[in-house]
Amino acid sequence: MRKSFYTWLMTERNPKSNNPKAILADLAFEEAAFPKHTDDFDEVSRFLEEHASFSFNLGDFDSIWQEYLEH
C-alpha cells in the first residue's frame, strides 16, 4: 500500500530550502486542514486550488505529484 501523499511529502521538509517540494512540505505541515490520509491526486489538487490558506504553483505541484508516484 502506498504512503499518503502527506506522509511522503513530510520527508522533504526543509525550511532553509528554496526547492518547491520542500516549500510545499513546509506549507502543508503548517496547514491543519491539509488532507493527510489520501493518495488521491484530485483530492489534494482540489484542496490546493480551493481551500488552502496559502498559494502554491500548481505546475510545481504536478511535478511533485509525479515524483510521489515514482517513489
Curated annotation (Swiss-Prot):
InterPro entries reported for this sequence: UPF0346, YozE_SAM-like, YozE_SAM-like_sf
Family that this chain belongs to: Belongs to the UPF0346 family.
A Pfam family this chain is assigned to: YozE_SAM_like
Protein species of origin: Streptococcus pneumoniae (strain P1031)
Name of this protein: UPF0346 protein SPP_0954
Domain of life according to the entry: Bacteria
NCBIfam families named in the record: PRK13672.1
